[in-house]
């Protein structure tokens, strides 16, 4: 499935010295988001910073949203994860995409201009309504939770 999303460039370096968001491979689910800063930034251990991307998107279609997710290598190798764990971008949001970056390691981490720091994945959305009931139709699982369907 291919969807066209409106993208607004908020910083003139985007598309010039800092590439536009792009899929790294044909099989990539996420577009790499890059940091749009002027100079290297130190992120201290346990510090959280809000990093600009220099872009805004407008999804427009209420059946679509986007999520900002961490890059696995940064988290595993450097302890760099998203401060909010997942960033949800609603279809009607039009502001700059910013990345909450948390250094959960015990080492300082340097973020350089243009670094790929997160990824943007588009997802389908179902807007549900609720039907208030007194009882549910019984299922095999019932009310079991928190490990009830397996060892963990």
Curated annotation (Swiss-Prot):
Reactions the enzyme catalyzes: dUTP + H2O = dUMP + diphosphate + H(+)
Disulphide bridges, residue numbers: none
Pathway involvement of the protein, from the record: Pyrimidine metabolism; dUMP biosynthesis; dUMP from dCTP (dUTP route): step 2/2
Positions of substrate binding: 71-73, 84, 88-90, 98
GO biological processes: dUMP biosynthetic process; dUTP catabolic process
UniProt entry keywords in alphabetical sequence: Hydrolase, Magnesium, Metal-binding, Nucleotide metabolism
Molecular function terms, GO-annotated: dUTP diphosphatase activity; magnesium ion binding
Cofactor(s) essential for the protein: Mg(2+)
Enzyme class: hydrolase
Domain of life of the organism encoding this protein: Bacteria
EC number: 3.6.1.23
Annotated function: This enzyme is involved in nucleotide metabolism: it produces dUMP, the immediate precursor of thymidine nucleotides and it decreases the intracellular concentration of dUTP so that uracil cannot be incorporated into DNA.
Family the entry assigns: Belongs to the dUTPase family.
Descriptive protein name: Deoxyuridine 5'-triphosphate nucleotidohydrolase
Species assigned in the record: Legionella pneumophila subsp. pneumophila (strain Philadelphia 1 / ATCC 33152 / DSM 7513)
